UniProtKB/Swiss-Prot annotation, chain A:
Post-translational events: C-terminal thiocarboxylation occurs in 2 steps, it is first acyl-adenylated (-COAMP) via the hesA/moeB/thiF part of the MOCS3 homolog, then thiocarboxylated (-COSH) via the rhodanese domain of the MOCS3 homolog.
Family: Belongs to the URM1 family.
The organism of origin for this protein: Arabidopsis thaliana (Mouse-ear cress)
SUPFAM superfamilies in alphabetical order: MoaD/ThiS
Entry protein name: Ubiquitin-related modifier 1 homolog 2
From Swiss-Prot, chain B:
GO biological process, one term: tRNA wobble uridine modification
Entries under InterPro entries matching the protein: CTU1-like_ATP-bd (IPR056369), CTU1_C (IPR032442), Ncs6/Tuc1/Ctu1 (IPR000541), Rossmann-like_a/b/a_fold (IPR014729), TilS/TtcA_N (IPR011063), tRNA_thiolation_TtcA_Ctu1 (IPR035107)
Similarity comment: Belongs to the TtcA family. CTU1/NCS6/ATPBD3 subfamily.
Subcellular location: Cytoplasm
Protein's name in the database: Cytoplasmic tRNA 2-thiolation protein 1
Length: 99, 355
């Protein structure tokens, strides 16, 4: 499945200062669905190059990191349980930098 | 699948207009709202805060403390919008401080310069180098990475006042948001700083000083500010200051964010707690006066900036760090005057958080 991942608000610094990543992720196990939970663990392993604690806390994003799936607040779609579809656009924005 | 779709559709309308797909869950109310309704309530609530607290008078010149970051960028955008829409009759300006931090402030100032054009607001930049003869880079070279945030915070506070005086404005607005204020309430409790605790929740401060400051975002959640900037594609700068690993404030911030995740109202409730504290009349508060050297407000003989500057210029950078000593006498001269508005100008460490 193809996704567009966008990092903003300073989070791009954790992945080589690249804001937009077009990625291809194969379904992990045999299940035919991919959730945000799966995506986060993939991102942590494959995209985050430094200070992962700035991005994640436990198995979810660090409080203060906003997540949008197709420009919609992930709090409306079930957060970690949000089911992803091919070509979804997922945006991560840190609110923790500067004023 | 059928059931799932139905469920999705049922919960998939904005609970304000009942027409469009919601894009955001409001932390303040937990309402699910669409983009158009979000813009409307976001702007309208700020307008109500401005009106109810009588923040401005028609014809006033107002400077917006602009760092190029999310809060001040959204503030500049929203305030110029509301000024037009509701005929506030304000002359708005952008005021930026150049601390002289290569790779951080020089970049963020580029953002402010673009904002000047985008929003049509005249920009004034005042620099530490011009005001004090030192850039933060030079200060850090001399004192290292300890206490540098103290210098920066103290200098910034005065620099904003001086810049505001140069612009001949009647008021200065800053982008401090609800999360910032909750965090500061907590920090002041942790530090036992009663003087600041009693004033950090005021929407307007310094009314008896040269230039009052106010915080139109006092009740605005950081999440909504960032969402607003994202949806409106506002141009802001977001890099951590290269010199600021302020651990103590960082912990407080993280704690607030953890609380918010469990119960978003916690932020407003902490602000409410801060507002409702009553300071015992027996509490000693610093007495307000003016600095003998530069005339700036100070509770001591010399203001904090002058003490720090003297230390730098004499090669004794530890001077003025920690509890007052040296020029200002061996003891903390804090005395009585219960209830008097405390105004020691030693600033909050770090970042753009001056209260």
């Amino acid at each position: 499945m193809q996704f567009t991942l966008e990092f903003g608000g300073g989070l791009e610094l954790l992945c080589d200062s690249v804001k937009i990543h077009k990625v291809n992720i194969n379904l992990l196990n045999d299940s035919d669905i991919l959730t945000m939970k799966d995506l986060l663990s993939w991102v942590r392993t494959n995209l985050i190059k430094e200070r992962p604690e700035m991005f994640m806390k436990g198995d979810t994003v660090r409080p203060g990191v906003l997540v949008l799936v197709n420009d919609c607040d992930w709090e409306l779609s079930g957060q970690l349980d949000t089911t992803l579809e091919d070509k979804d656009v997922i945006v991560f924005i840190s609110t923790l930098h500067g004023g | 699948m059928e059931a799932k779709n139905k469920k999705a559709v049922a919960s998939r309308l904005c609970c304000l207009c009942n027409l469009r797909r919601p894009v955001l869950k409001r932390p303040k109310t937990l309402q699910q709202i669409c983009r158009e309704c979000f813009y409307e309530v976001f702007e309208e609530e700020i307008h109500q805060v401005i009106v109810q607290n009588r923040l401005f008078k028609s014809g006033e010149r107002v400077a917006i403390g602009a760092s190029g970051g999310k809060d001040s960028t959204v503030l500049a955008y929203v305030l110029s919008e509301l000024n037009r829409r509701h005929n506030y009759g304000l002359d708005l300006f952008l005021l930026s401080i150049d601390e002289g931090i290569t790779g951080y402030r020089d970049d963020s100032l580029e953002t402010v310069k673009r904002n000047e054009v985008q929003y049509g607001l005249p920009l004034k930049i005042v620099s530490y180098k011009d005001l004090y003869g030192w850039t933060m880079d030079e200060i850090v070279k001399m004192i290292g990475l300890k206490n540098n945030c103290t210098f920066c915070g103290v200098f910034r506070r005065q620099a904003l006042d001086r810049g505001a005086a140069l612009l001949k404005v009647e008021k200065l607005v800053t982008g401090h948001n609800a999360d910032d204020i909750a965090e500061t309430v907590l920090l002041n409790i942790l530090r036992g700083d009663i003087a600041r605790l009693s004033r950090c929740t005021s929407i307007t401060t310094g009314e008896d000083g040269p230039i009052p400051r106010c915080k139109p975002f006092k009740y605005t959640y950081e999440k909504e500010i960032v969402m607003y900037a994202y949806f409106k594609k506002l141009d802001y700068f977001s890099t951590e200051c290269i010199y600021s690993p302020n651990a103590y404030r960082g912990f407080a911030r993280e704690f607030i964010k953890d609380l918010e995740r469990i119960r978003p109202r916690a932020i407003l409730d902490i602000i409410k707690s801060g507002e409702d504290f009553r300071i015992a009349t027996t509490t000693k508060m610093p007495e307000q006066g003016t600095c003998e050297r530069c005339g700036y407000i100070s509770s001591q003989k010399w203001c904090k900036a002058c003490v720090l500057l003297e230390g730098l210029n004499r090669g004794l950078p530890k001077m003025g760090i920690g509890r007052p000593r040296g020029v200002n006498g061996d003891h903390n001269k804090e005395t009585k005057k219960p209830g008097s508005v405390a105004k020691s100008i030693e600033s909050k460490q770090c970042g753009s958080l001056d209260f």
